Amino acid sequence: MSHNTFGHLFRVTTFGESHGVAIGCVVDGCPPMLPLTAEEIQRDLDRRRPGQSRFTTQRQEPDAVKILSGVMPHPGTGEQVTTGAPIGLLIENTDQRSKDYSDIKDKFRPGHADFTYEAKYGIRDYRGGGRSSARETAMRVAAGAIARKVVSGMRVRGALVQMGPHKIDRDKWDWDEIARNPFFCPDKDKAAFFESYLDGIRKSGSSIGAVIEVVADGVPAGLGAPIYAKLDGDLAAALMSINAVKGVEIGAGFGAAALTGEENADEMRSSSSDMGNHGPVFTSNHAGGILGGISTGQPIVARFAVKPTSSILSPRKTVDRNGAETDIFTRGRHDPCVGIRAVPVGEAMVACVLADHVLRHRGQVGAS
């Protein structure tokens, strides 16, 4: 199985399965002399960790990360810093229940990657989905914590802005509210609604989808490249690679199709400071901070749609490996809305793409 690596200069390779001994990643290309501790990575992992509320899977994984390589004490200060060597990270799996999946080892679960993995490789890991499980995304979050070190002047934040058909009130957006509720929701009133709404979904044994928005502030103008190395193209690919994601948009996205040219084009005004260093002032941001594949200096805004968790309690019709029709009953522990824990994953992927483009920009034009 190839294609377990993404990035060009800031490269992340993940490995491990949902019910294997451990999951891990190797981050290659991280610059040296950046302060980095396991505790800093752990803070990001704890935001994604399962079992923290009744609204996520009850699989109890501490997700305790170990740094295996790529760091050492600074020769002068003693502070742990990166060395420029590949950074190896490992998380041991501790709460697998593979027996929950024994009844479906020969059946294809609707909405899952069971059939497609079998069709491609002739074998699949039915125990929690193997590589196709969202368990893999823990290592993306760990890599994202390192990426944030590379782009320390930028701030990457995500929020759940829609659950099912219910959208937040953008006039009530409060970034501080995200840490106060289990949904990463910036709208206090809608977070209270989501609690009762998702309780009903959860108790019925069903699931629901969500839309996540990630905003990156402090991104300088000039990151990215034309045609085949567009910043928005890489962001879209990175976000689409997340489990259960079925759509990505940048800025106005699909909404731009309903706008006129006058409405969509972000007008510019002269800034009071040196244009060469700071650029113009934009009167809107329908472009989502990217034009021609290159950042404008405005906040980068990306949204992605997460489908409902395919593992639900109601019986479904399917076929087995022999092509015979059969019923399937899903057991195990699953998220009623996998979009909740996708928020820190989306942040991590955006941070990794930005780190990669910072290093590529530095290599091409010599700028820091």
Curated annotation (Swiss-Prot):
This protein's GO CC annotations: cytosol
Pathway membership, UniProt: Metabolic intermediate biosynthesis; chorismate biosynthesis; chorismate from D-erythrose 4-phosphate and phosphoenolpyruvate: step 7/7
Gene3D superfamilies under this entry? Chorismate synthase AroC
State the disulfide connectivity. Answer: none
Q: What Gene Ontology terms for biological process does this UniProt record contain?
A: amino acid biosynthetic process; aromatic amino acid family biosynthetic process; chorismate biosynthetic process
Q: What is its EC number?
A: 4.2.3.5
Q: Which CDD domains match?
A: Chorismate_synthase (cd07304)
Q: Which residues bind FMN?
A: 131-133, 243-244, 292, 307-311, 333
Arranged from A to Z, the UniProt key words for this protein are: Amino-acid biosynthesis, Aromatic amino acid biosynthesis, FAD, Flavoprotein, FMN, Lyase, NADP
Reaction(s) this enzyme catalyzes, per UniProt: 5-O-(1-carboxyvinyl)-3-phosphoshikimate = chorismate + phosphate
MF annotations from Gene Ontology: chorismate synthase activity; FMN binding
Q: Where does NADP(+) bind?
A: 48, 54
Cofactor(s) needed: FMNH2
Q: Which Pfam families match?
A: Chorismate_synt (PF01264)
**Enzyme's top EC category:** lyase
Q: What does this protein do?
A: This reaction introduces a second double bond into the aromatic ring system.
| Family, per entry | Belongs to the chorismate synthase family.
Q: What is this protein called?
A: Chorismate synthase
